[in-house]
């Protein structure tokens, strides 16, 4: 088969491996890299390159992550793999590697284990939309009934956390045997790649989403009016569009009468661009940093939500001591700090540095938010935690 020429115009999808320690996540990552490079072209990464994950810092948190890329005939994938359980927790909560879908690796010799459950729960909390299961080490299980039982168990576990356990793809394979080049097991990797292609829908691009820009600064320009500046997070704003100012105070509507970038006037501002937006009839005091400019009706302000939080360890520059209920830190959303109070889950008295925990947060003023929004927890400007909005209450 002729190698397909690598082209950048294929849809780009972000995926990653999750699952219990030693169930074969990194071996599977290497197997996918090898088999797809051999079949469709591209560069193969071996186990040691992936396992030796470089250290990254995301919002001051140290995370070890390996990034590899591979291609199928129709798509280009970026794939993340983490060496340790703590790295997964941090990665998923900070959104350092946003996943459009995850490959849950379960060793068929063990079945679901504690971290299998924890990674599924985390995926649910942080909004990983799709999960595909790879049952690994199937070459070591002779009994077909046993494999069937493990598959049922995994499907039930996924259903428990509101994933469609009965309908999602489960591939039974052996990452190690595929990596060693045995054709029947290589075929299972191709099957997994086909499942990624068909089961995970093409992600919506930022530019196609409704317009939103966090406001970083506000200026008054004599004779022209008020300009707000920031980096457009998603969508497009055009001159003449009606926009809403959301968060901190009551929501107001206004019209974009101008877009400028580097002192040049433009017709529109697009996702990823830093621009200034001129607002009709808006006074300098009507807007402040921390609010967002958005397409009307696309986002609402909220104060109370459930979150999944990672608390920085002392080594990461976090707190040296635990915190208790009644803790009142600042929650940093996009461009601003807002004070909030926390409620810990029943039976939890204190939270130690290095823990991850589910907590209910009530802010003193509303912030424009959707489920999946990331935030930092700060004390006097120092980051002590990272979190994600899992569920909005009010």
UniProtKB/Swiss-Prot annotation:
Region (G1): 19-26
InterPro entries associated with the record: EF-Tu_GTP-bd (IPR041709), EF-Tu_GTPase (IPR050055), EFTu-like_2 (IPR004161), EFTU_2 (IPR033720), G_TR_CS (IPR031157), P-loop_NTPase (IPR027417), Small_GTP-bd (IPR005225), T_Tr_GTP-bd_dom (IPR000795)
Boundaries of every tr-type G domain copy: 10-204
Documented EC number(s): 3.6.5.3
Chief subcellular location: cytoplasm
Binding locations of GTP: 19-26, 81-85, 136-139
Keyword Cell division: no
Keywords: Cytoplasm, Elongation factor, GTP-binding, Hydrolase, Magnesium, Metal-binding, Nucleotide-binding, Protein biosynthesis
Region described as G5: spans on this chain: 174-176
Location(s), subcellular: Cytoplasm
Reactions catalysed, as given in the entry: GTP + H2O = GDP + phosphate + H(+)
Span list, region G4: 136-139
Pfam families, sorted: GTP_EFTU, GTP_EFTU_D2, GTP_EFTU_D3
Entry's Gene Ontology cellular component terms: cytosol
Binding site for Mg(2+): 26
Record region (G3): 81-84
Region: G2, residue numbers: 60-64
Domain of life: Bacteria
Keyword Protein biosynthesis appears in the UniProt entry: yes
GO molecular function: GTP binding; GTPase activity; guanosine tetraphosphate binding; translation elongation factor activity
Description of how the protein assembles with itself and partners: Monomer.
Described function: GTP hydrolase that promotes the GTP-dependent binding of aminoacyl-tRNA to the A-site of ribosomes during protein biosynthesis.
NCBIfam families assigned to the protein according to its UniProt record, in alphabetical order: EF-Tu, PRK00049.1, PRK12735.1, PRK12736.1, small_GTP
Name of protein: Elongation factor Tu
Species assigned in the record: Shewanella sp. (strain ANA-3)
